[in-house]
A protein has these predicted regions:
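Short amphipathic alpha-helical segment within the helicase RecA-like ATPase core
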Residues: 1-199
Length: 200
């Protein structure tokens, strides 16, 4: 086998709770970073948690690895650790052509969720002076280049005052930078589907 490192992990049986599966792949991701892996191939096998299928497993592996190789280093010194894993390959066997297509989509979905988790981590890890309302707004608006279905509406203090958002504005009154509020809409579902709203 042409691999610099081979990691053998004691697997789980189908009765193991979901958090045990997540913890196992989190450990694999962290080990990949510590070994400074650039390419990582994982063979999850055919055993899945009870009431889950192989597509759930593939999505979970992609999501968990992507979101756990993340290391924040932007404002740290040059010697700080940085993530090294650039490529993940999930190895499967015995899939029909249609199942393989579904498996690839599951991997893409997992990777996308992992990227979203990493974006939230990144914004949360930024120091306050690197994460002001204007900076966050700029970063979010930049995402519309990659996601054309993403729509951003911004409101300044005067507009929020007219909407009666006094409680919101009272929180930011002592800040040096004026408050901003964004409404972010992603309309990727069907027109008759109920929307999902997150407030925070």
């Amino acid at each position: 086998i042409a691999a610099a490192n081979i990691l053998l992990v004691n697997g789980l049986d189908s009765s193991a709770p979901t958090h045990k599966w997540l913890s196992m792949y989190q450990s694999i991701a962290h080990k990949g970073n510590s070994l400074k892996c650039k390419d990582m191939s994982i063979m999850p096998g055919n055993t899945c948690p009870t009431k889950k299928d192989e597509f759930w497993l593939i999505e979970m592996v992609a999501k968990t690895i992507e979101s756990n190789v993340y290391i924040f280093s932007e404002t740290k010194n040059k010697t700080a650790s940085r993530p090294t894993v650039k490529k993940l390959t999930i190895l499967t066997s015995g899939l029909t052509p249609s199942a393989l297509t579904k498996a690839k989509q599951a991997a893409k979905t997992g990777y996308a969720i992992g990227e979203g988790v990493n974006t939230a981590k990144y914004l949360g890890d930024l120091p306050a002076n690197h994460c002001t309302p204007k900076i966050i707004e700029k970063k979010v608006k930049a995402m519309t280049k990659d996601f054309p279905k993403l729509k951003i509406k911004s409101f300044n203090e005067q507009q929020m005052q007219k909407m009666g958002m006094g409680s919101f504005l009272s929180v930011s009154r002592g800040s040096e930078e004026p408050a901003r509020m964004m409404v972010i809409e992603y309309k990727g579902g069907k027109a008759n589907e109920k929307p999902i709203a997150l407030v925070g």
